[in-house]
Amino acid sequence: MTLTDISQPAPEAATHTLARLGIPESYVDAHGNVQTPPVMTLAAVAEAVSSGPVVEHALVCAPGQPCADLVGDLTDLDGQPVPGPEGIGPAAGYYHLHTPEGGRRLVISAPERLPQPVRGWGWAVQLYAARSRSSWGIGDFADLATITRSAAEAGATSVLISPVHAAAPVPAQQSSPYSPASRQWLQLLHIAIADVPGADRVDLRDLERAGRGLNGERRIYRDTVWTLKRAALERIWAATRDDLPAEHDAWVAAQGRDLELFATWCVLAETYGTAVWREWPVQHQHPDGATEFAAQHADRVAFYAWAQWVADVQLGTACRAGATVVADIAVGFDSSSADAWTHQGGVCFDFEVGCPPDRHNLDGQKWGLPPLNPVALVAADFRPFITMVQSALRHAGALRIDHVMQLWRLFWVPQGAGAGQGAYVHYPTEAMLAILRLEAGRTGAWVVGEDMGTVAEGVRETMARYGMLGYRAALRLPVDQFPEAVMGASSTHDQATIAGTLTGSDMDDLRTVGKSANFEQLEGVRRELAEVAGVDPDGPIGAEEIHKAVLAQYRRLAACRARVVLASLDDAAAVAERPNMPGTVLQWPNWCLSLPRPVEDILAEPLARELAQVLGARD
């Protein structure tokens, strides 16, 4: 579809299907105004969604509770009969209901509420940015262990990290952790090479020197980091592959076909020099055509499976080291990703997910992530969603779901259209929420839904009913009005830091990159922050003034009702730059700036210690 197509009238037949397909003809934006998507957008979205198979929606029930629709023969997913009274929810789990009419439905039996966190505080950290002296140019899982251990010693209950989803093993390495190659597998850049089993059996001194040398500047060079770490992993693999521990063999076997496909995709990307799988030879553009290739490259496929095991072990160690790790789940995956390759039949590549203009982003956003077809997701028994959640909860004690509206609806923007020219598509909310309750209940994990921006009516009420915390971030006085059932923060990765706000450098950055913003309002926020901190907004702003402002802001957060409050390591380190500037590509070093000093130093500095005291005094 081209931009000129969007203004054309929609075929009448297409508009008739909108309600049935869960595509609203209008929506209420963040300012309370009713917006109507372009008619050609609605028609194109309807055509894409209706291309999926016709299936029955999943049936959600609760263990031991009456369920009138639970009539028929119940089996487990392997087809074995499940005994029990008809019309009563079975034990928590997934089942198939074979109805008297000959149909089959997925049954999700889940607890009625999610586990809950205690009142407390924690650190928010962009893991890639949290380098230590021993890092190889990027924060790693050993650094995460340092952070969680330090956090627990300081009295923190949690550590929220940026997504650690997998990236493609070829240049250019994707900078954004929110645009992954797979949400099921892990980012190999976060492997701490010194902690890899067998690292002591090979000489890595040359690679280590080069890796640590990357810590000399704040810019993170992922391609260079990957070149060095891949070389180190290859040396260790060559020395250990013939006598790998039984734990490795058991783990790889347990991951089964999913891991085999991901590792095969990695080798295909290496072989053809690109992760854009639609540019590969036709026979390899689909997993079914890659079986012979995988057999021919069995050692390399095994290498990538082993590397995932290494990453998984290290993440598990970090998650057990101290405070509860809150894993972050991205909205989707890159169109050239392993997940897109694996699940391509259910991916709508002619669209990208985004959000309409709101008070945080006046131009709206396009995230470059193709949406899953909700009809195809139901037909697949939600397997892509289930495996993603299970992977995230393998070690983490809590989840943050970025853009929690992904469980209700997503804003589909046609390729080539502006961010404001999209339309919403609804998803099977009750089933996806039940999956979350089931998987979180199995591990005792609590869940946070990032519900900022444009949020549909009734969403927050549903979150509260099931025990999902919301997310609030604000530098302004309304932090005092945060509700209790939320995770509260001063800002998100897309917003200004305290130092950037107080100095005014964030406004300068916005102007430099050409971003639309209400600069009068932003100046008001700056002056309000200065007043609360007892700082002259028109005087010189240096380290002392920033120190005062950081403590003043977090005193406000400490006193708010939010169940869990977060202090960012960016604020503890007085970082002025945003981690990410939405709507920019080359104009800003998105996701590429490390913290200005080693993370172990930042955690030991007076500001971090004082922040811990302020937040630790929460009643």
Placement of each model-derived feature along the sequence:
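Basic helix-extension-helix modules of the SAP/HeH family
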Residues: T2-V49
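A generic structural signal for well-ordered alpha-helical segments
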Residues: L18, A151, A318-G322, A440, ...
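Short, polar loop/linker segments at the starts of domains and inter-domain junctions
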Residues: N33-V34, S134-A142, W280-Q283, T503-M507
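Extracellular ectodomain segments of secreted/surface proteins
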Residues: T41-V82
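Extended acidic/polar, glycine-enriched regions
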Residues: G72-G120, A130, W136-T148, E153-A154, ...
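Beta-sheet entry/capping signal
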Residues: Y94, R104-L106, G120-G122, T148-S150, ...
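Alpha-amylase-like alpha-glycosidases and glucanotransferases acting on alpha-linked glucans and related
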Residues: V170-D312, G316, G332-L566, D570-A572, ...
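Structured C-terminal cap/extension of enzyme domains
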Residues: A574-D619
